[in-house]
Amino acid sequence: RQITAKWNKQQFSKGWRYGEGEALAVVKPGTLLEIWKILKICVKADVIVIMQAANTGLTGGSTPYDNDYDRPIIIINTMRIDNIHIINEGKQIVGLAGSTLYDLEKKLEPFEREPHSVIGSTSVGASIVGGVCNNSGGSLVKRGPAYTELALYAKVNQNGELELVNELEINLGSNEEEILNNLQNRNYNKSDIIQSNKLASDNDYSNIVRQINSNVPARYNADKRLLYGVSGSAGK
């Protein structure tokens, strides 16, 4: 789905709280593979890409901000891709690009578990991925910031080429199309999930938050300790 009419783009180019600017188009892919194909076109055309989920406007990072950019902007809205896979008997989940904290909360209820974050925008569709990209801690001090070393993401390498990085620790295939389709359709078995030592949460937080005499806050933005892959990437 592609949106180019100015009036129809407004709900995507203007944040609920703040942030507003012009975008050449808004694209709403329905699969992970469609995101990949759109990104390839955008990289080749040398346009700015803003990845967007619910556009809650809490951080201002999911919309253009003013109109002083040096290149056209394409907004890729991921909310159609909202699958959540429960794995390892409910101990872990795989949240696709547009999956939300609200849906995660419902899916975890049978396992008597709760999401990593409870934030003000949970009820309006705040995404799991958005929280990880911003190390969002939410309103509950005891849960700490969102953090993972397990992710599948695209990046532009030093040669200006689009590259798919699989750090998810799930065997999904050998090429981009195979990997993305297998993940989208949950075409993997328990035996494909690698039991690694990579972290899916901030395991130091429980100690840090107890340091009541420290001059350093337990949680703060751009904490270098929590920068890894997509974690703390601010959606870049």
Range-by-range predicted roles:
Residues 1-44, 56-94, 236:
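N-terminal flexible segment immediately upstream of the FAD-binding catalytic core
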Residues 23, 29, 48-51, 117-120:
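Proline-rich low-complexity regions
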Residues 51-55, 62, 78, 97, ...:
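Glycine-rich, histidine-containing beta strand-loop boundary motifs that form or position
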Residues 85-87, 97, 101-102, 106-236:
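FAD-binding subdomain of flavoenzyme oxidoreductases
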